[in-house]
Amino acid sequence: MNPISHVAIIMDGNGRWGIKHKNSRNLGHKEGLITVEKIIDVAINNKIKFLTLFAFSTENWKRPKKEVEYLFSLLENFLIKKIKILDRKKIKLKLIGTINFNKKLNKLLKNSEKKTKFNNSIQVNLALNYGSRSEIINSVKKILKKKMEMNENNLSMNLYTKNIPDPEILIRTGNTHRLSNFLLWQLSYTEIFFEKKLWPDFNELDFRKIITRYKKLKRNFGAL
C-alpha cells in the first residue's frame, strides 16, 4: 500500500460552475472555498501531512479586474473568519508564490502564516501569484548568486517548496488535462488524476476514492 504525504490540487472549474448555476463566476469561487474546507478535513483524517492548493496563478491577472478583486476579497474574508478554526484544527498555512497584493491582503496572509507556523496536523500550501517556470528560474538565480553547485538537490532546495516532499498525487478538477504551469519540477513522478467534476462539485467521497485508487497502484519509478 502506497503511503501518501503530499497531495497537490488544481482547483479548476469555479467560474464555469457559477455560470452554470447562477450565471455568476463569483458564486463559483465562493462555493469553491466551501469545497476547500471539506477537502482539508479529509486530508487530515487520512493523515496527509501536506496539501498544496493552486489558488491564484501568475496568469490569473489576465482575468477581468472585477473578478480578480472579488477573489482577493473572498480570500480576505476567509482568513478573517476562519483563521481561528484553522488554528484550532492545528492547520499550518504556508504561502508559495510572489506575495505582492494589496496591503490589507498581504498583511492578512503574512499574519495567518505566522499565527499557524507551529501547527502540525497538516501544512496547507497556498499557491498564490504562483508560476512554476518563474519559480525554477528564481531557484537557478539563487544558486548562481550563492555560487552553489548546479544539481537537482540544490535546485529543489531553492524552490518555494524546499523541505516539502514532492506530491504523490496531483488532482485536477474541471475536465481539463494540463498542468497549467503548476509545480512542474515537483511533479516528475507524481500520479495525476484528472476529474470531470468542477471544483465546487468535487466532494469528500471523490477525494477518498482517489486516495484508495492511489494506494492500490504499483509504482516502479522507471524500474521493472
Q: Where would I find each of the regions flagged by the language model?
A:
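Flexible, compositionally biased loop and terminal segments
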Residues: 1-224
